[in-house]
Amino acid sequence: MQYDVNKIREDFPILSRSVYGKPLVYLDNGATTQKPRCVVESITDEYYSVNANVHRGVHFLSQQATNLHEASRETVRRFINARSISEIVFTRGTTESINLVASSFADSQMKEGDEVIVSVMEHHSNIVSWQLQAARKGIVLKVIPMNNRGEL
């Protein structure tokens, strides 16, 4: 399958910007991702029409927001072919997700002296999550180095 990069870029309004006279390229997706137009429009629509606490109220807007939230969980489940919506956990971002995985895995599966191996190429949030678990539980963190050719 071949993708039309220019067509995809059109879906991301921020990528229409130029930086130093060249089209913007954004690769720091471990920190935050740029949102396609449909996501920005959907978030804006939510703020304008159904903004309320999810699972925290019995009033109309809260119920509507909760229904939309749970419908999105089902959409994600189908998209990634998960068996159940209980497998879908929404977090604020990658760092929180990695912290949650590292903490829950360390608590349920690891003991002092167990090893976790990461590469030097990991995003900072993944390294820090495991450093915290190493300090907390006595887990041994090993880092795979990279050679001069960028290989592990």
PLM feature segments, named:
Residues 1-152:
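Pyridoxal 5′-phosphate
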